[in-house]
């Protein structure tokens, strides 16, 4: 080939975000086709300052990056970690190494990340950088209809894994300083006991679930006692991308096919079905980004916003509502960053119905506590459990019944609410029913050692039902329900119809999302000083 026909050199930059893994990573595989390559993770101030970010999230990400940097270095790929706004960091790095292609996975994130991506796209166009994004979940961009969505999901999940089959040529020799630490980022220790970070830990967790722990999955997932061991515990790894959804799906299908135990196969099929729901809820945010900030059903606007009780909110955040199961679950979540789904739903239901708190402040608090915070799932579930979708069944949990059903021996409550350690079991779910003599024997004076119930269970539940069902019977609510159903409601088979992603980025949309993201990053939230 003559010199005039030679292919010009191309330099790829792999932009890592919530895909902190080596295996089944399409951007890394694509980078092998370029002359040379390097990778980058950006610690963005917009992330650190966002109201849903917690130090534990940063800590987990740094742990993932430490392992990934070593793995990529063994293949000749440098991994840079830089601090700053995305466009600023990319522009500076472009000046240093003149990369020609930007490779990354698609992301369905909170408002600030969408605004960031719009800005990065504009910058890439201005300097003639080709930015290629790859899918990594079942979420479909610019989706016009949910018809066929299940087939697309299945096709993506059944496609061959994207595995690295070669070595990289390092772009240039760059100084790679040590990874930042929480201290160097100005972040205080979080004090949580977190799951192990990184792809190796993720694979161990997946293996143990599919081989042993998942046997009682269907029976054990509702109780916080048994769910801790019998749930997959993969959610943080899916959230930070140390495992791909496709890897989990295919490994699960292999395990189902290979086990001779029909009961185990049945349990794993239940888990496999939830993988598709994972992407289904993410699709809701992809289709309608405003659900992070606004009610699905706008007829619910004003329902709770003007009645926010700061004292109730503080008690709920701190696990001192006087309802033992609520308090035990909240304290456990704060300490570990994880809680099983039913108990998460109970916490939200109690806040939304018993305490009549709006889902946005409570959702931000929980987002910071959940190590596995996934925006699409989180905000969809916050609204479902708060009754503001306009179409889903109203789920109102009795904290007393949940204690009796899910912690019948009181082991979970006694572990996380030590004030109740000596309370007799018949009173443990409702300690306020002890007479004073029993309280003294149990060393638990209600109102002194442990709070009295913050609200009356039956009175609060009745008031919430009256308001919610009254609203749903209104003409406006019925009319809007049809529209919400068309955009987000479930079809037969559990695959709901959906609207379409913003196909183009209008200036008005960008300004609105940017304004909301900026306001909530700079304005102290009402819960901001409780768990810094």
For the regions a language model picked out, list residue spans one by one.
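Active-site "lid/cap" and pocket-lining segments within catalytic core domains
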Residues: 2-272, 282, 389-532
């Amino acid at each position: 080939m003559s010199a005039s026909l030679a292919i010009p050199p191309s330099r790829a930059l792999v932009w890592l975000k919530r895909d902190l893994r080596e295996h089944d990573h399409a951007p890394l595989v694509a980078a092998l086709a370029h002359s040379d390559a390097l990778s980058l993770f950006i610690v963005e101030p917009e992330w650190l300052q966002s109201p849903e970010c917690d130090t534990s999230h940063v800590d987990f990400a740094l742990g993932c990056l430490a392992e990934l940097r070593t793995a990529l270095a063994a293949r000749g790929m440098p991994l840079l970690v830089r601090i700053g706004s995305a466009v600023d960091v990319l522009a500076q790095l472009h000046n240093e190494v003149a990369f020609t292609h930007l490779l990354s996975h698609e992301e369905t994130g909170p408002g600030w990340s969408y605004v960031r991506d719009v800005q990065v796209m504009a910058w890439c166009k201005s300097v003639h950088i080709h930015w290629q994004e790859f899918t990594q979940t079942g979420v479909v961009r610019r989706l016009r209809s949910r018809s066929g969505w299940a087939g697309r999901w299945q096709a993506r999940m059944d496609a061959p894994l994207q595995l690295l089959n070669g070595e990289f040529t390092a772009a240039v020799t760059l100084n790679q300083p040590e990874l930042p630490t929480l201290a160097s980022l100005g972040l205080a220790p979080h004090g949580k006991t977190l799951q192990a970070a990184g792809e190796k830990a993720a694979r161990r967790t997946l293996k143990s679930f599919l081989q042993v722990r998942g046997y009682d999955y269907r029976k054990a997932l509702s109780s916080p006692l048994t769910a801790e061991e019998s749930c997959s515990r993969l959610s943080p790894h899916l959230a930070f991308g140390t495992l791909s959804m496709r890897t989990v799906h295919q490994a699960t299908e292999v395990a189902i096919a290979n086990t001779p135990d029909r009961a185990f196969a049945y349990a794993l099929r239940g888990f496999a079905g939830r993988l598709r729901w994972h992407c289904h809820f993410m699709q809701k945010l992809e289709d309608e980004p405003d659900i992070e900030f606004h009610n699905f059903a706008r007829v619910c606007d004003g329902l709770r916003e003007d009645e926010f009780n700061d004292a109730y909110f503080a008690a709920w955040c701190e696990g001192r509502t006087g309802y033992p199961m609520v308090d035990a679950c909240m304290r456990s979540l704060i300490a570990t960053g994880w809680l099983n789904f039913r108990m998460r739903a109970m916490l939200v239901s109690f806040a939304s119905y018993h305490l009549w708190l709006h889902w946005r402040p409570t959702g931000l608090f929980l987002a910071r506590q959940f190590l596995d915070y996934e925006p699409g799932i989180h905000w969809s579930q916050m609204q479902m459990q708060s009754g503001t979708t306009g179409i889903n069944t109203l789920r109102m949990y009795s904290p007393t019944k949940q204690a009796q059903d899910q912690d019948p021996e009181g082991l979970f409550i006694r572990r996380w609410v030590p004030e109740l350690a000596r309370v007799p079991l018949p009173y443990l779910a409702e300690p306020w029913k002890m007479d004073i003599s029993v309280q003294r024997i149990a060393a638990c004076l209600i109102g002194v050692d442990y709070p009295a119930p913050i609200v009356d269970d039956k009175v609060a539940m009745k008031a919430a039902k009256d308001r919610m069902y009254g609203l749903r019977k209104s003409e406006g609510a019925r009319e809007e329900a049809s529209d919400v159903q068309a955009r987000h409601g479930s079809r037969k088979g559990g695959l709901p119809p959906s609207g379409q992603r913003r196909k183009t980025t209008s200036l008005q949309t960008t300004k609105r999302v940017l304004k909301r993201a900026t306001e909530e990053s700079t304005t102290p939230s009402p819960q901001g000083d409780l768990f810094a």
